[in-house]
Amino acid sequence: MGQKVNPKGLRVGIIKDWEGKWFADKRNYSNLLIEDVKIREYIKRKLYQAGISRIQIERAANRVKVSIHTAKPGIVIGRGGAEVEALRKELEKMTAKQVHVNIVEVKTPEVDAQLVAENIASQLEKRIAFRRAMKQTVQRSLRMGAKGIKIACSGRLAGAEIARTEWYSEGKVPLHTLRADIDYGFAEANTTYGKIGVKVWIYKGEVLPEAKKPAAGQGGE
């Protein structure tokens, strides 16, 4: 099971949190969900060069808070905050709600699976050999503190007639262990031979559940 399912979805509610934090009744749920998808697609398309790792959306009454996790906050914010203000106005026009945009910097993009996948995809588009791109990326991630990494490239690799999947991995990636903090990312490279899919799994170590504090008057000195 752990081999097939999205590692993030499998761990939601255990060691990972939801990307969208809001509640809605039956009438509004589908509309808000579609709105979330549109917001994410718009931001990703507009700011692809900024290295967007993930987008969190929180809702309260008629307000929407969008947290953008990016490797290059300078591109998102712009000179004097002009870019982020323009983005906020576009989102307000799209949703007809009050929008607050929060920028969160990704300190180590080398161990962020989504950014790693997008980096490999951009290298493939520049005609860099897929094995070289995979190997260099794995070594860089392990140097920056990843416990293990696994990469899969699928498609007409090196312009081959028949599509295939090539794997490269180092370290350990325990997909079945629910307390294992595994990041997952997916990107597509648009080459002259067609699309090449890139999947990345990065193991960052185990997340241990917090120890329960003793009740008042018990176990304390």
Curated annotation (Swiss-Prot):
GO MF, one example: structural constituent of ribosome
Pfam families named among the record's database cross-references: KH_2, Ribosomal_S3_C
Keyword ATP-binding assigned: no
InterPro entries referenced in this protein's UniProt entry, alphabetically: KH_dom, KH_dom-like_a/b, KH_dom_type_2, KH_sf_prok-type, Ribosomal_S3_C_sf, Ribosomal_uS3_bac-typ, Ribosomal_uS3_C, Ribosomal_uS3_CS
Taxonomy, superkingdom: Bacteria
Keyword Ribosomal protein in record: yes
Keywords, alphabetical: Ribonucleoprotein, Ribosomal protein, RNA-binding, rRNA-binding
KH type-2 domain ranges (all copies): 39-107
PROSITE patterns, per database record: KH_TYPE_2, RIBOSOMAL_S3
GO biological process, one term: translation
GO CC, alphabetical: cytosolic small ribosomal subunit
Subunit annotation: Part of the 30S ribosomal subunit. Forms a tight complex with proteins S10 and S14.
Purpose of the protein: Binds the lower part of the 30S subunit head. Binds mRNA in the 70S ribosome, positioning it for translation.
Similarity comment: Belongs to the universal ribosomal protein uS3 family.
Identification of the protein by name: Small ribosomal subunit protein uS3
Species classification: Bacteria, Bacillati, Bacillota, Clostridia, Eubacteriales
